[in-house]
Amino acid sequence: MNVCVMGLGNIGLPVVQHVSKVYRQTQGYDISLEAVNAVKKKGIDASTELACADIYVIAVNTWHRNGYSDMSAIEDCTKQALKLNPDALICFESTLAKGTARKLAEKYNSSNMAVCPHRWWKQEEDKYGVIQLRVLGALNQESQKKALDFYNTLGIPIHVVSSLEIAELSKLVENTYYYLRIAYAEDLKLLCEDNRVSFEELREAVNTKWNVDMAEARDGIGGECLPKDIQILIDTYPNMPLLHGAISTDKNYRAKIAHNPFGSKPETQQIEENNNSNNKSHGT
């Protein structure tokens, strides 16, 4: 069984490393020679020329730019892979806008397609690496069986859902949910600062309740995934005022801390600055 991992960036690199431990005939592919050489240095076959494979794992970037969801790299990889092997199983691990996989299956006449979004987190790769529970949706029963066989062989536990679209949305909703949590914390922190109340002490207090897990508020919502994924979800479902409000909250928060950084005036702010000095960054 030949496996090709397409896209050797932050996600594709750990993926190809893991896959190559299980499947001897594994190749990494990327248009970046630098990315290819980084994989080769780890003793794994890689190239800027795409090879024929039985399974293609697509882990390239997707974007939200110029006001729309950009899935162009996904389509380009799908087109190239199916040109080499029309019967190959295509496994998307990238973030996809809802409906992307099905549209590509119809456009390029593929009957073997699955969506299994990554949940990899660089800051805690040992705990949240390639091997962790993942969501998988497939085009049909045959695709589902092939994809399950593949991921089971890799030792990756799978939660099966009924469609490609549910799997696509799961990644967007996960990251949007976290975005909303952080935006609420940002709003609350500004409220606390205006009223000379310690946000960190308040957060610690409310987090003692079993069903409360208030996020931290730091220097705005960053990372590669959170700001992008909430916009992609809005493209699909524009009539969600809560999401628009969260984006506005983060913009407002960023503007205020840029103008008047925390820790420069009241004692409560200095306490929060010190407490946050060792915080980990937000995940993606």
Q: What residue ranges belong to the model's regions?
A:
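NAD(P)+-binding Rossmann beta1-loop-alpha1 motif at the extreme N-terminus of oxidoreductases
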Residues: 1-51, 270-279
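NAD(P)-dependent Rossmann-like dehydrogenase/reductase catalytic/cofactor-binding core
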Residues: 2, 52, 145, 193-284
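Electropositive phosphate-/nucleotide-binding environments in soluble metabolic enzymes
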Residues: 29, 68-75, 98, 141, ...
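Alpha-helix C-terminal capping/helix-to-coil transition sites in glycosyltransferase folds
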Residues: 51-52, 131
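Rossmann-like NAD(P)(H) cofactor-binding subdomain of soluble oxidoreductases
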Residues: 52-55, 63-124
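Internal alpha-helical scaffold of NAD(P)-dependent oxidoreductase catalytic cores
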Residues: 105-114, 121-122, 126-212, 236-239
